[in-house]
Every structure is written in C-alpha cells, then in structure tokens.
Design a protein with these regions (language model features):
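Active-site HxH/HxHxD metal-binding segment of metal-dependent hydrolases
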Residues: 44, 54-133
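Divalent metal-coordination and catalytic microenvironments
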Residues: 12, 28, 39, 49, ...
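Short, well-ordered secondary-structure micro-motifs
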Residues: 26, 102-104, 223-224
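Residue-level marker for buried hydrophobic side chains located in beta-strands
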Residues: 36-38, 67, 90, 169-171, ...
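Conserved beta-strand hairpin/beta-sheet module of binuclear metal-dependent hydrolase folds
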Residues: 3-56, 161-173
Length: 235
C-alpha cells in the first residue's frame, strides 16, 4: 500500500488526504504522544488513516479518541475499521449518534428534486460503529489544549465543526467546502440546506489562524477573512 502523506497544519495537527485533497481526515497529537483522529473517510479509507498514523511515528495503541464531524459515509465509512484497529469507539454529536450506531443515514432535503429521488433509495451501506461520547454544542473536549464542538446542523442533523483552541485550527467539516474555491455542500446531500447556510455563519464569528476542510485544502493566509467573505457573499 502506498504511504499516505500527512500534511502538517500546526504543531501536533495534521491533515490526512484520503482521496487526494477531496476527502480529508485529521490527526492531533498531544505532549504525551496520545492521538485523536477526526473523520475516517469512506469504507476503504480506514487503512489509509492507520498508514498516516504510522507516518508520524504513532501507532494504534497511541490513539485515545476517535471523533466524527458527522455521520455521512465519506466521513464515517472508515470508522469501523479504525475502531477495530484502535479498540476505541467514536465520539459524535448526539443528533448523529444513532445513525452511526445503526449504519443508517438521515433523510435528505425534501426540497431538492434529486433529494426526493434519494429518499426512495436504500441507505448506502456503512458498517455500524460503537459510539462512545455523544457530543454537545459548546463542549470542550479535553485534548491538546481543547477541542471545542461547534454544532453546525443542516448538512446532517448532528453536523459539528471543531475548533482546536490551542493550535488555532478550525475544522469546518462539511459546513463549507474548499473544492475549486469556497462553496456550499450539494443541496441534495444535505438534510436541510437552508439550515446549513444559516448555521455556517457561526464559523465567521470564531477566531482561528488556519481553516481546514474535510473537502479541499486548508487556508493558511487570512482564513477568517476568507470565510467571512464567502459567508457574506453566498449566505
């Protein structure tokens, strides 16, 4: 298997390109060499996550926490593999927890014509995963200086962005994409597209020095201004 390169974002923070820059996971390592993994890509990406872990000199036994921005299969699909490898359950916002437990998906936006078609199709297959902690808005997970949970529902009911308070990295999740520029997730893949656009405004109110996306490369130069400009124009 080809080595999965980890992209440094800040001291102790890496982006894992799982399908090029189009689908990303993240690794955090604290001063005690413990590791938190955030988002594990599609079903076949679990092995890539573990390879990226080894590429920074860590292993399965160093992982103390798995976290998901939301329940969709391009983020949670690889979680079962990584959970087995590390022996850890996944932590996810309480409004998405049951979908991960049952391997199911939330309904898509009924105002989308293609979304209406999707509602008639069976859920994409995704392995069930044990859930550890059900996260809530405003909660600060005690790891590497604090991971603040920012509930940004709409793309899914329990979608959350994560602010790494010590390193100044914002992980947007799918609240905003950075594929060929900033853009919204596709309406047909959202549970409530209008809510997606409304709750993403919260990301313009936060302080951070790097904006990292689960879809697309990071923004290192004036990220908050870039996010606020997008929100003002597209919101």
């Amino acid at each position: 298997m080809a080595k999965t390169a980890a992209v440094p974002l800040a001291p102790g923070v890496w982006r894992i390109p799982l399908i090029g820059d189009y689908v990303n996971g993240f690794m955090l390592r604290d001063e005690d060499d413990q590791v938190t993994l955030i988002d594990m890509g599609i079903g076949s990406s679990g092995a890539k996550v573990m390879a990226a872990l080894r590429s920074i000199g860590s292993g399965a036994s160093d992982v103390t926490r798995l976290m998901l921005t939301h329940c969709h299969p391009d983020h949670a699909g690889g979680a079962a593999h990584v959970s087995r490898e590390t022996g850890r359950p996944v932590d996810i916002h309480t409004d998405d927890a049951e979908y991960v437990r049952t391997g199911t998906q939330p309904d898509v936006d009924p105002t989308s014509r293609i979304g209406k078609l999707f509602r008639k199709l069976p859920d994409p297959k995704m392995e069930k995963v044990n859930v550890g902690e059900e996260l809530t808005d405003g909660q600060v997970v005690p790891f590497a200086g604090g991971i603040r949970v920012v509930h940004t529902p709409g793309h899914s009911p329990g979608h959350a962005s994560f602010l790494l308070e010590e390193s100044g990295v914002l992980i947007t999740g799918d609240a905003i994409f950075n594929v060929l520029g900033r853009r919204w997730p596709l309406k047909m893949l959202c549970s409530n597209f209008a809510m997606t656009k409304k709750t993403a405004q919260r990301l313009g109110e936060l302080e951070y020095s790097t904006a990292a996306f689960t879809h697309g490369p990071e923004i290192r130069e004036n990220p908050r201004e870039e996010i606020r400009r997008f929100l003002a124009k597209a919101g």
